[in-house]
Amino acid sequence: MVENKRPAAGGAQTVEYPIICPYCFNQAAGGRPFSHKDVHFRAETVYPNLHAIEQMMGKRKVDIEMMTNTKEQAAAMSQFEAAERFLQKDDPVYNRFWSDYNSTSEQESRMDNGIKPWTRPVIRYGDGVSRLVTDSDGFVVAAVDNFGKTTHRRVCPHCHNPLPLGFGKNPVKNISIIGITGAGKTVYISQLLKGMVDYAAKSGLAAFFTSDHESNFIAANQVAKGKPLPDSTLPNSLSQPMFYDIIQSNGSSKKTDTIVLYDIAGENCRSAADMVRFARFIEHSDGLILLIDPKQLNFTSDCDEENVDAPSLALNTLHGVITGQQGRKCTIPMAVCVSKSDQCFDILPSMAQEHIQVARRNEMGVIAKEFDGSAYNQLSQEMTRLIENNALSVCNILQDNYLNFNFFAVSAIGCDCTKNENGVFAPSMKPEPRRIEEPILWLFKQFGFIRSNTKVLRPYPIKQPDKEVWKPGFLGIGGKYVRVEGELARYEEEKIRETVIREGGR
């Protein structure tokens, strides 16, 4: 995460709005942030070919070259060459990034006027841009090109991928959503995005999307009665990151954080070799959501024998990517989620609860910024027992390699699906998602956006390092430190110490 700072008062030198690209993470610059003033832009001025430039100028290039007045020829040729800077063409920098993922997943919008956005000329201040435009806080939001047209299409200077509205102005948290094969990740993300504004509101936050990627994802992966369920994410392909801003209001003040969601196919997590192209997104994650099909945990009678080892493989691969070494635990908070949990009502009674995360108002009528820990703890304990009884190896890997995790059960559809005449499954009634917001609200608690209405139980207590407690000598004369065995941290709110601490003494 990069903490973005406004310019300090009194002219003090600070890092002004440092930006880490959500696509390439500035790998070309060794991961160093770039300034908001160094962003590049996709131009609004676009000439599809040389003929269009000649039409604009009223002269052919060959006619300019044959002009006899040297001064007029130089001026005309300078104008022509300036326009050539705005020719529509393939962008080798952009294409180089997407060559790792077969092809780009960026889509055209109505605002593109039939021009593929990644073929627009990329310009920057001093090279096609005559003036930068800032907002009231001095943050660069647009640019005026050499032909007087204003563009708001900011792109990363290293990979030329689009930066959404206001990206880089506020602190950023990255969340990777990883779906083991068959877990229904695409359906889960579509339903989560569809309800995100309401889910945030129920926890006292405001949320709004800052790009087209979110609505494009929902439109391309619709979940509705009688509509075939969307296809799973193709291995080795990369969906566009999805962006939204989370606003915390406190009286007259507001704090904004940007959330970036990454869609990672579980097929890319089976081995380190498969993860090479996606490692950058996992490594830069501030939170993880791992979706597992209940069949892969032996929760149902028709267990998935072929992929029963997939959760263990994914957990081991993720640990290797994040820590890079054995013996070191991953500290990134991870929500381990059993999907399709409506199939498990008989063994998960908490899933049958109708109302989870009900908005609670304080004495002033303001919705409390909180996670419903009291409702969650019951589910967490049920989940821990079930996974221990049915997939102990998964529990062992989590305890050995992950410090901050918890169990969740979600259902993105919440109703039966029937197979149509083409052999494709579709919801048989209006989908009713259950508890799909809980993992991300738990991450919001981890990030400090909200608190819990009660202490949240860890799935397994963590033994704290020992203490050295001061024991006074006889009659209070002298004394010594006596080592006392570390206590068990049963709740997430209890901070885990890294070393032995001393208490008391002189």
Where does each model-flagged region fall?
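Conserved nucleotide-binding/hydrolysis micro-motifs of P-loop NTPases
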Residues: 25-28, 265-268, 294-298, 341-344, ...
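Conserved GTPase G-domain signal focused on the G5
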Residues: 184-185, 375-386, 414-452
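Glycine-rich phosphate-binding P-loop
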Residues: 173-199
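Conserved C-terminal guanine-recognition region of P-loop GTPase G domains, centered on the G4
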Residues: 249, 253-256, 276-401
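Long, basic/Gly/Ser/Thr-rich N-terminal segments
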Residues: 1-166
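Flexible phosphate/Mg2+-sensing switch loops adjacent to catalytic phosphate-binding sites
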Residues: 164-168, 197-235
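Switch II (G3) loop of P-loop NTPases
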Residues: 255-276
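Beta-strand-loop-alpha "switch" segments that mediate conformational coupling across diverse proteins
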Residues: 397-418
